[in-house]
From Swiss-Prot:
This is Dihydroxy-acid dehydratase. Disulfide bonds: none annotated. The lineage of its organism: Bacteria, Bacillati, Bacillota, Clostridia, Eubacteriales. It comes from the Bacteria. Homodimer. Keywords: 2Fe-2S, Amino-acid biosynthesis, Branched-chain amino acid biosynthesis, Iron, Iron-sulfur, Lyase, Magnesium, Metal-binding. InterPro entries: Dihydro-acid_dehy_C (IPR042096), DihydroxyA_deHydtase (IPR004404), DiOHA_6PGluconate_deHydtase_CS (IPR020558), ILV_EDD_C (IPR056740), ILV_EDD_N (IPR000581), IlvD/EDD_N (IPR037237). Pathway: Amino-acid biosynthesis; L-isoleucine biosynthesis; L-isoleucine from 2-oxobutanoate: step 3/4; Amino-acid biosynthesis; L-valine biosynthesis; L-valine from pyruvate: step 3/4.
Length: 554
């Protein structure tokens, strides 16, 4: 066993003495040592209950003959960090989580790992760690929050963000906003739509790193506890068979994940995270691959924010296995890949079926013949930009309008709330990329303000930052190269006409190439906003969004 390095032989008597100081017995030290990474904390609703998940995982490990060793991981709540300096830290914590899990796992020679995440950056951070460490591993997430019905509307966190915009526009009273605040998040779990957390939890299942049900079983259901116990039992089997992440996270597994991503209409953040996870196993996923898969995989689901269904509805309709079963009917998935069940994808979905075709469309009756995410290119985004096509109003799929340029999210929010944005405008928020932010903040506050004020069918927003999975509307992010790196978005001026053509994958500023080159020569990078601490180091090392915003060894 790998753990023999810390527990076998006379030379390891001091090591065993330290284990015994914590109450471990000789019998426990004879068994496989399984690291259990628990990201439970009291600031993230999706993580407040993870102690119960961890206890179930540890029970499963013991039942199967292993010895669990629990340790903690950090986790930021993107919702609470939203709209202020705190959001600069969110994406950056993905790397901190991966690095800290790597350090703990390799420092203590665990035989296997169980990762317990739930929310936005914790899931990909732990998947990156699993891939990098490459000992047998399984992910068991905390599960989605329920959506509560209020006044004939299914609420979620995004409902509250949009309510603030509606209040600013005089369309809701303060009391009505308060009622949303009281009802929108009824308990523990990852926010209830197909936002980033649930997107990544579902894709974990598709990649083969989580058990069937990992993405959709609600947080408060007893089935989630049973799933955690099964994950604990399964990791011991994976250790015995030495099935590692490198056996599971193959190029075909990532193609499956991208296909289901398109079918579900996942968060655009998945386009940041899947390349970063792939990078850990030496693979490259670029925007061209994403576009190719999007062009042939139909969109089968319109979950919030694209529609009114939530993840609990997807669960009731058959979950991720049912979606995969539909895609398999047109040979859009690789079915002979090994997963953490010890079985193949084909075996995992063999008995799956759609129970509600209102939630999961038939492969022959999709919402659209192409996927939920589109990659755009043009002179405004030579290296690409990303939009959640499934959440864009039909009238905004093709749009031209004058640029309204802001050099920070804060300035844009102020202008939107003060009624300074007009129908037809294209709001550009720049210097919010991985380097420029630094940290590539999510723009949920401005997009929700636009939607809440009733402008989501008239106003587009373009940024080198990124968007929450809860964002809807013509919200185009990840513009690469970013402004801080001298990308063309840095030289756009107020009044320049911006041309958006999502069906044809185009994003341009309508000025001559000679003028673009002239402005680029005159441009000078502004001083970095943050130079100290972790974000200062992060800004120096982070790559462009089109590469997954990974840290590069320079």
């Amino acid at each position: 066993m790998r753990s023999d390095a810390v527990k076998k032989g006379i030379e390891r008597a001091p090591h065993r003495a330290l284990f015994k100081a914590m109450g471990y017995t000789d019998e426990e030290l004879e068994r496989p040592l399984i690291g259990v990474v628990n990201s439970r904390n009291e600031i993230v609703p999706g993580h407040i209950h993870l102690d119960k998940i961890a206890e179930a995982v540890k029970a499963g490990i013991r039942m199967a003959g292993g010895t669990p060793v629990e340790f903690g991981a950090i986790g930021v709540c993107d919702g609470i960090a939203m709209g202020h300096t705190g959001m600069k830290y969110s994406l950056a914590t993905r790397e901190l989580i991966a690095d800290s899990c790597e350090a703990m796992a390799l420092a203590h020679s665990f035989d296997g790992m169980v990762f317990i995440p739930n929310c936005d950056k914790i899931v990909p951070g732990m998947l990156m760690a699993a891939a990098r460490i490459n000992v047998p591993a399984i992910v068991v997430s905390g599960g989605p929050m329920l959506s509560l019905r209020h006044n004939d509307k299914n609420l979620d966190l995004n409902s509250v963000f949009e309510a603030v915009g509606a209040y600013k526009a005089g369309k809701m009273t303060e009391k009505e906003v308060w009622e949303y605040e009281e009802k929108a998040c009824p308990g523990c779990g990852s926010c209830s739509g197909m936002f980033t957390a649930n997107s990544m939890n579902c894709l974990t299942e598709v990649l083969g790193m989580g058990l069937p049900g990992n993405g959709t079983v609600p947080a408060v259901y007893a089935e989630r506890i049973r799933l955690a116990k099964k994950a604990g039992m399964k990791i011991v089997e994976l250790v015995e068979k030495d099935i590692k992440p490198s056996d599971i996270l193959t190029p075909k597994a990532f193609e499956n994940a991208l296909a289901v991503d398109m079918a579900l209409g996942c968060s655009t953040n998945s386009v940041l995270h899947l390349p970063a996870i792939a990078n850990e196993v030496g693979m490259e996923i670029n925007l061209d691959i994403i576009n190719e898969i999007s062009s042939k995989v139909p969109n089968l689901c319109k979950l919030a924010p694209a529609g009114h269904h939530h993840v609990q509805d997807l669960y009731a309709a058959g979950g991720i296995p049912a979606v995969m079963k539909e895609l398999s009917k047109k040979n859009l998935l690789h079915l002979d890949l090994i997963t953490v069940t010890g079985k193949t994808v084909r075996e995992n979905i063999e008995n799956a079926k759609v129970r509600d075709y209102e939630v999961i469309r038939s492969i022959d009756n999709p919402y659209s013949p192409t996927g939920g995410i589109a990659v755009l290119r043009g002179n405004l985004a030579p290296d690409g930009a990303v939009v959640k096509r499934s959440a864009v109003a039909p009238e905004m799929l093709v749009h031209k309008g004058p640029a309204r340029v802001f050099d920070s999210e804060d300035a844009a929010i102020e202008a939107i709330y003060n009624g300074k944005i007009n129908k037809g405008d294209v709001v550009i928020i720049r210097y919010e990329g991985p380097k420029g932010g630094p940290g590539m903040r999510e723009m949920l506050s401005p997009t929700s303000a636009i939607a809440g004020m009733g402008l989501d069918k008239d106003v587009a927003l373009i940024t080198d930052g990124r968007f929450s999975g809860a964002t809807r509307g013509a919200s185009i992010g990840h513009v690469s190269p970013e402004a801080m790196a001298g990308g063309p978005i840095a030289i756009v001026r107020d009044g320049d006409i911006i041309s958006i053509d999502i069906p044809n994958g185009k994003l341009d500023v309508e000025i001559p190439d000679s003028e673009i080159q002239k402005r680029l020569k005159e441009w000078k990078a502004p001083a970095p906003k943050i130079t100290k601490g972790y974000l200062g180091r992060y800004a120096k090392l982070v790559s462009s969004a089109n590469k997954g915003a990974i840290l590069e060894n320079k």
